[in-house]
Amino acid sequence: MPNTLTNVKDIKVAQSALQPFSSTLLPIRAFSTNFSPEPADRLDTVRVPIVGAPAPSVDFAGSYTTNVDSTVTVAPVQLNRHKFKTIHVTARENAETSLNVLETLLQSAVKQLAQDVLTDIFTEITAANFGAPAIPALAATAFNYKSVLGVREACAVANMPVGNRALIIDSAYFTNLLGDDIVAKSFVTPVSQSGVVDGIIRRLAGFDVYETNVIPGNAEKLVGFAAHPSAIAVAMRYLEPIAEYEEAGAITDPTTGLTFGYMRYTHTDSNRIFITVECLYGFKVAIPNGLKRLVKP
């Protein structure tokens, strides 16, 4: 279900913000997820299925239960993260502005909320959690197709499953990759045409490729990573408000389940309309061999 709001105007405003929220969080598809508009409280636990590399086959020896695959596990993820953004306009501003000022403000707020959530999740990608980088540290100007092949080789050495791999890289590294001769002159239309026209690389060397500009700037010197969904488990739910609001509900992407909460209320003394958007979520490392980091010098 797309949302749980009832007011037509609120539905229109909230739905306009769903696309920037979902598109900003697109790189989160690289991980194992359990997203839903189901209500939950902070510190509740959500079970996220994790599928790693399958166990080898064995010769039949009289029983089919001796080689039961145990690589499908469930990671308990605590919903211990809660971020929000609040916008407001005066009743006069809302009535006299030619464009829908609430929609414009909310789209910007929700995009920032999504960026902050994504940055927070990326803080889990550390040397302590995932070990040495895939390839030696390099600057953005040195990142090219051969670098991607080096990352691919590191994933193979780590026995990362070949399917469902993703490569998430900082915008500067992504831009340099767009200018690589092999990428730019590729005869594979989904790579070359989208790269030139839209600045998009959908698939490369077996990876789904995502550009991001929200990688945390800290001592880890992280600029990207290659990941299988088994690396990190992420959960997201709707935090149902306790107080009374003029309108409140969950806004959900029906395809991915990505959800943010929406609350509208009015401050009568100042004659201002407030809208708060929030995200209740949690994450944890699942299988360390499911991710290989990229770092800068």
Could you tell me what each predicted segment is?
Residues 48, 167, 273-277:
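Hydrophobic alpha-helical segments involved in membrane association or supramolecular assembly
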Residues 93-162, 171-176, 293-297:
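Alpha-helical scaffold segments that mediate packing/assembly in large oligomeric complexes
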Residues 42-47, 155-256:
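Extended oligomerization regions of viral-like shell subunits
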Residues 56-59, 97, 176-179, 186, ...:
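Short helix/loop capping segments that flank catalytic or ligand/cofactor-binding pockets
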Residues 1-79, 295:
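N-terminal "assembly arms/tails" that initiate or stabilize quaternary assembly
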Residues 259-297:
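Extended, compositionally biased alpha-helical segments that mediate assembly or anchoring
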Residues 73-96:
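Short acidic, glycine/tyrosine-flanked loop/strand segments centered on an H-E-D-like triad
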